[in-house]
Amino acid sequence: MSTVGSSSEGRHSVRCFRHRNANTFLTYSKCPLEPEFIGEHLFRLTREYEPAYILVVRETHTDGTWHCHALLQCIKPCTTRDERYFDIDRYHGNIQSAKSTDKVREYILKDPKDKWEKGTYIPRKKSFVPPGKEPAEKKPTKDEVMREIMTHATSREEYLSLVQSSLPYDWATKLNYFEYSASRLFPDIAEPYTNPHPTTEYDLHCNETIEDWLKPNIYQVSPQAYKLLEPSCLSLEQAIADLEWLDDTTRMLQEKEREASTSAAQHGQVKHPGLEASDDTTTGKTISTGLHMMKKLSTMSLTTFPSSSVRAGNDSSAAKKTT
């Protein structure tokens, strides 16, 4: 029973093993065979799978014994269910799939004592090209396709048309994104503005003379400028006081002029033909004096106004005379 059981277990282990890969990594431990002998044997063994490259390297263990590594690359995947398929004489080969052929080849060649090589090595992610055939044309990536479209498209319509013909699936599922990118690459050109009301003659300009209103109302002199123009003014405070006095005097004369004009209009005074305004008339004096002073204040130089010190002396002498 045990024999039958053991034989059944052995058959079960053989049935469970399966190797199917185009790149095979083999290790023969404690194997003194020559690399060339192993390589030629593997080439004949896998002829039906069209071997493209075989590399066999012999190394020494730390105890001085030999062991061999082999990298086998075939055009067709090498398929077997026999775990002793790659055995050579009495030396059993450890079978592994070489998922990264670059790393396997680098590992095999780390410290070779003897090496045998046949065929053309196929780097990772590159298909094998048999001798006499040209490599297949590389298919451009989506990034390369879009870069080509953006470089050559000249309008929004042409851009969307090229995307539709080059990337139909992406155009059908992501059309809103392509429409947005088209609007950014080819924005609408703003039309030049046209005034609905064409320009006409200068009929809306103000005909008032601003200068006549500006001088009596917004005539301003800074204390610094007044101090420079008036030699008798020795300080900034004195200049401010003089300017305030001038402002008060001007306003007082303007008010008297308005009162005199209103009084004359209310009494209905009529000028006699040929008679000029006389200094004997009280109203005439006031109007004449007011107009004269206003013109004088608005046209005379600032240097004609007395400084505060002189004005104070005049005010005191006038008070004594009045007393």
From Swiss-Prot:
Class in the EC hierarchy, top level: hydrolase
The protein's Enzyme Commission number: 3.1.21.-
Name of this protein: Replication-associated protein A
Cofactor(s) listed in the protein's UniProt record: Mg(2+); Mn(2+)
Family: Belongs to the geminiviridae Rep protein family.
Annotated segments matching region Disordered: 256-286
Motif (RCR-2): 67-69
Intracellular or extracellular location(s): Host nucleus; Host cytoplasm
Region (Oligomerization): 181-193
Domain CRESS-DNA virus Rep endonuclease: 18-121
GO cellular component: host cell cytoplasm; host cell nucleus
One Pfam entry name: Gemini_AL1_M
Placement of sequence motif RCR-1: 25-28
Matching InterPro entries: CRESS_DNA_REP, Gemini_AL1_MSV, Gemini_AL1_REP, Gemini_AL1_REP_central
Residues the record lists as binding a divalent metal cation: 59, 67, 69, 111
Active-site residues annotated for this sequence: 107
Natural source organism: Panicum streak virus (isolate Kenya) (PanSV)
GO molecular function, one term: structural molecule activity
GO biological process, one term: DNA replication
Domain comment quoted from the record: There are 3 rolling circle replication (RCR) motifs. RCR-2 may be involved in metal coordination. RCR-3 is required for phosphodiester bond cleavage for initiation of RCR. The LXCXE motif specifically binds to host RBR1.
Keyword flag Lipid metabolism: no
Record motif RCR-3, residues: 107-110
Recorded superkingdom: Viruses
Alphabetical UniProt keywords: Activator, Covalent protein-DNA linkage, DNA replication, DNA-binding, Endonuclease, G1/S host cell cycle checkpoint dysregulation by virus, Host cytoplasm, Host nucleus, Host-virus interaction, Hydrolase, Metal-binding, Modulation of host cell cycle by virus, Nuclease, Nucleotide-binding, Nucleotidyltransferase, Repressor, Transferase
